[in-house]
Amino acid sequence: MDSLYRNAAETPVEAPFVFDSHILAEALKNLYKRKYDPKKEIDPLLFSEVSRILGKAVDEGFGNSDIEDEFIRQLKSSTEVFSAFKTHRMGRDMAAKLLDDKGQLKSYRQFKQDVLPIASHHIDNWLKTEYNTAVRRAHLAADFERYKRNADILPNLRWEPSTSVNKRELHIPFYDRVWAIDDPFWADNFPGSLWNCKCGISPTDDPLTDNSDIITLDVKPHKGLDGNPAVTGQIFSDDHPYHPTDCRHCPFGKVKPLQITNSTKDCHNCGKVRAVIQDAEEKAKQRRKDLMKLHYLKLKDKIKEDFGLDSIVRIPAPKSLCTGKLKLTPESLKLCLKGYAHTPSLDSKYCLLKAIQNPNKLQHRDYKALGEGKDLSNPIDKKNVEKKADRGVTGYNYYLFEYKGKTWVLGFEVINGEYEQPYFVALK
């Protein structure tokens, strides 16, 4: 994968996601305890985390686009297939570190020490490249769909040059050329067909350019990026190295050669792959619930031990909070620590704990009055604002906090202008 991704970006790219370290830790324990066979199975929690992140990439790529939900679901479905094979590759690579040179099972401490660099490479290097490419391809797919709807006004598309400082040569011959939007060219040649490609498309009514010389060019997409996602409905194609070369080598239900004599590999529409994904999703749902409950109780007990509940706690460095007071109640803690809506990962929950323990490190960045930026003509928004006002909420203070090498945004409700209480945690 390093050779495939090596030219993905001129400089390291900071992906706006956090791979939940607690889920990775749980996956390592499951692998060590042989709770699943990494040769033909995947860890449900590990899969769900990879799938969540790549699904988030699709959402980010589409933004506030008015593209139909069904098309977005189709693209997300394709990232689930990719996630299943990526998770299998991760499990297989990590399982290779279970035994020592004598074939004996290592201590868990040694196994963890040996395997963390591999996990880090999969996540910090490869997944970031995959995430950024998924965002770009989803965005371009949304653009293509939108431009097709307006083809009666602007019937052609121009290939826009890459915005990268160091442009790669493969797509340079396409720069500033114009094709009809329904030209077959776009099915096989499309921006985003190279890892972290930063080329683009734009609609135009300019005349078509002479593209006859393009036929002689042998510009092949990178492995895993074949085809226009707006045409195929796939963010990643199944020729990516994570995928098997053919059905006989598939880890998810190997079949005899005679059974697939007339079959063509189609991972995105394979019933066996879908069955693996469905099983992993069902198991992950319950395991996430159990994991969240376990850590919620740990966090709750720790905060209660350090600060107590139902009490206004004076901050050691009052200037770090605008009001100088932080109130921790069972209600506010449950809101932030038990569910997903306000703190979507275990890391975000532990970030809140660390911030409460070290309030002097909070950096105030903004304040918004209750209702600011909301459409109060919308009955739902209006009711939500009124409900908060009844609780005494007058506004929100936003703070930055460093945790695990990332910058987080913490939102605190301001109650009657007197004190603050935790409300949400999000990655900056």
Model-derived features: where do they sit?
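Short, charged low-complexity intrinsically disordered segments located at boundaries
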Residues: 125-127, 143-145, 161-168, 200-202, ...
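Conserved short secondary-structure elements within globular domains
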Residues: 134-208
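A broad, low-specificity signal for short, low-complexity segments enriched in glycine/proline
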Residues: 55-57, 117-121, 155-165
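Internal glycine-rich, Lys/Arg-flanked active-site/core loops of soluble domains
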Residues: 100, 108-133, 137-153
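N-terminal leader/targeting and assembly helices and adjacent pre-domain segments
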Residues: 1-119, 206-355, 359-428
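N-terminal start-of-chain detector that recognizes signal peptides
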Residues: 66-71, 127-133, 168-174
